[in-house]
Amino acid sequence: MSEVSNVIDIRGIMKMLPHRYPFLLVDRVLEIEEGKRIKAIKNVTANEQFFVGHFEQYPVMPGVLIIEALAQAAGILAIKTHDGEVRQENALYFFVGIDNARFKRQVIPGDTLVFEVEMLRVSRGIGKFAAKAFVDGELACEADLMCARREI
């Protein structure tokens, strides 16, 4: 029986994901149920590097970065499920597929993105996930994602 874990802060996330600033896009894990689901957040600030050029007079978080953040949350779920608290040094989880991506609202400075990712299945090292991002309870983005665990 799976159990819902406590919060994982940025230090714990950095033990799992190889990403670093400016490409680490998950700030905190609120809930994680190994093998099933994760709920995490990204606090979007005006200081984000991508807002310099997207767009100066009307800053909007690029949709591809919302998708990347969802993939990072899926990666944390996969790592926590299969590797434990720390990613194994000889393995990485690669983002390998996306289907049914839809963007429903703009994400702007001051928003808090809430990621909800469900692990649908894992077969031969490839995981399939249903992912959604919300702002203030309103759906901002949804997609079906795949990631693959590979030895390096």
Curated annotation (Swiss-Prot):
GO terms for biological process: fatty acid biosynthetic process; lipid A biosynthetic process. InterPro entries: FabA_FabZ (IPR013114), FabZ (IPR010084), HotDog_dom_sf (IPR029069). Its EC number is 4.2.1.59. It is an enzyme of class 4 (lyase). It is found in: Cytoplasm. One of its GO terms (molecular function) is (3R)-hydroxyacyl-[acyl-carrier-protein] dehydratase activity. Gene3D superfamilies: Hotdog Thioesterase. Keywords: Cytoplasm, Lipid A biosynthesis, Lipid biosynthesis, Lipid metabolism, Lyase. It catalyses: a (3R)-hydroxyacyl-[ACP] = a (2E)-enoyl-[ACP] + H2O. The keyword Manganese does not apply. GO terms for cellular component: cytoplasm; membrane. It holds the Pfam family FabA. The active site is at H54. The keyword Cell inner membrane does not apply. Belongs to the thioester dehydratase family. FabZ subfamily. Involved in unsaturated fatty acids biosynthesis. Catalyzes the dehydration of short chain beta-hydroxyacyl-ACPs and long chain saturated and unsaturated beta-hydroxyacyl-ACPs. PANTHER family: 3-HYDROXYACYL-[ACYL-CARRIER-PROTEIN] DEHYDRATASE. This is 3-hydroxyacyl-[acyl-carrier-protein] dehydratase FabZ. The gene is fabZ.
